[in-house]
Amino acid sequence: YAEIKMIGERVSNMLRAALDAFTRLDPQAALEVKTEDKLVDKDFGVALDNMRVLMAEDASMIKSILCEIWVLKALERIGDHACNIAEQVIFLDRGVDVRHLSSAELRDLLAG
């Protein structure tokens, strides 16, 4: 359950930061949320790989591991929602749809 705890804490912080950025209309804080989402996605992928290995090693664990995977997927999705809030904050502040901008393009937009 270490992955669930780690990702859960990260996502909780992301959601809090996204809502704070929205409240303050702070695009820089929103950018940090978007950056954190990439880490959540990476951690989610690593956790899935670890769980695949565990299922291959011990078939009796498949049911409980699948439950963990569903929890992790839900947490990852919450992180995506926090990222969507952050994108809306930037849109409200700059009037630009940033959903498909690269990290470099987004940094340039907020710098200028």
Indicate where each model-derived feature is located.
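Cytosolic, long alpha-helical scaffolding segments
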Residues: 1-112
